[in-house]
Amino acid sequence: MLFSKSKRGYLFMIKSEKRCFQLIKHSVYKILHAVFYHMVLFISLRLGKCQSQYALLCKQDDKQRFLRRARWVEFAIVALT
Protein backbone atom coordinates (compact mmCIF):
# COMPACT_ATOMS: atom_id res chain seq x y z
CA MET A 1 0.00 0.00 0.00
CA LEU A 2 1.24 3.44 -0.85
CA PHE A 3 1.27 5.88 2.02
CA SER A 4 -0.02 9.39 1.71
CA LYS A 5 1.20 12.28 3.86
CA SER A 6 -2.29 13.41 4.77
CA LYS A 7 -4.56 11.36 7.00
CA ARG A 8 -7.44 11.91 4.61
CA GLY A 9 -5.46 10.56 1.66
CA TYR A 10 -4.42 7.54 3.73
CA LEU A 11 -8.05 6.75 4.60
CA PHE A 12 -9.03 7.12 0.93
CA MET A 13 -6.36 4.60 -0.05
CA ILE A 14 -7.55 2.12 2.59
CA LYS A 15 -11.11 2.44 1.25
CA SER A 16 -9.81 1.94 -2.29
CA GLU A 17 -7.97 -1.22 -1.24
CA LYS A 18 -11.06 -2.57 0.51
CA ARG A 19 -13.15 -1.86 -2.58
CA CYS A 20 -10.57 -3.56 -4.79
CA PHE A 21 -10.57 -6.60 -2.50
CA GLN A 22 -14.39 -6.71 -2.59
CA LEU A 23 -14.37 -6.61 -6.39
CA ILE A 24 -11.82 -9.42 -6.58
CA LYS A 25 -13.77 -11.48 -4.04
CA HIS A 26 -17.01 -10.89 -5.96
CA SER A 27 -15.37 -11.91 -9.26
CA VAL A 28 -13.95 -15.10 -7.74
CA TYR A 29 -17.36 -15.86 -6.21
CA LYS A 30 -19.06 -15.44 -9.61
CA ILE A 31 -16.52 -17.70 -11.33
CA LEU A 32 -16.84 -20.41 -8.64
CA HIS A 33 -20.62 -20.13 -8.74
CA ALA A 34 -20.65 -20.65 -12.51
CA VAL A 35 -18.26 -23.61 -12.28
CA PHE A 36 -20.22 -25.36 -9.53
CA TYR A 37 -23.57 -24.56 -11.18
CA HIS A 38 -22.43 -26.24 -14.38
CA MET A 39 -20.92 -29.16 -12.45
CA VAL A 40 -24.26 -29.78 -10.72
CA LEU A 41 -26.05 -29.48 -14.07
CA PHE A 42 -23.63 -31.92 -15.71
CA ILE A 43 -23.91 -34.42 -12.85
CA SER A 44 -27.71 -34.20 -12.92
CA LEU A 45 -27.76 -34.85 -16.63
CA ARG A 46 -25.24 -37.71 -16.40
CA LEU A 47 -27.16 -39.44 -13.62
CA GLY A 48 -30.22 -39.48 -15.84
CA LYS A 49 -32.26 -37.28 -13.54
CA CYS A 50 -33.17 -35.13 -16.51
CA GLN A 51 -34.43 -36.44 -19.82
CA SER A 52 -33.67 -33.30 -21.79
CA GLN A 53 -30.44 -31.55 -22.59
CA TYR A 54 -31.14 -28.59 -20.29
CA ALA A 55 -32.29 -28.57 -16.68
CA LEU A 56 -35.02 -26.01 -17.38
CA LEU A 57 -36.71 -28.45 -19.76
CA CYS A 58 -36.87 -31.22 -17.14
CA LYS A 59 -39.94 -32.26 -15.23
CA GLN A 60 -40.91 -29.89 -12.43
CA ASP A 61 -39.66 -32.31 -9.72
CA ASP A 62 -36.23 -32.65 -11.29
CA LYS A 63 -36.03 -28.91 -11.84
CA GLN A 64 -36.80 -28.19 -8.19
CA ARG A 65 -34.28 -30.81 -7.01
CA PHE A 66 -31.66 -29.31 -9.31
CA LEU A 67 -32.33 -25.78 -8.05
CA ARG A 68 -32.18 -26.97 -4.44
CA ARG A 69 -28.78 -28.56 -5.09
CA ALA A 70 -27.57 -25.40 -6.83
CA ARG A 71 -28.64 -23.32 -3.80
CA TRP A 72 -26.70 -25.61 -1.45
CA VAL A 73 -23.63 -25.32 -3.65
CA GLU A 74 -24.02 -21.53 -3.66
CA PHE A 75 -24.36 -21.56 0.15
CA ALA A 76 -21.16 -23.63 0.43
CA ILE A 77 -19.28 -21.18 -1.80
CA VAL A 78 -20.43 -18.22 0.31
CA ALA A 79 -19.37 -20.05 3.47
CA LEU A 80 -15.92 -20.70 2.03
CA THR A 81 -15.34 -17.11 0.89
UniProtKB/Swiss-Prot annotation:
Superkingdom of origin: Bacteria
Designated name of the protein: Uncharacterized protein PM1076
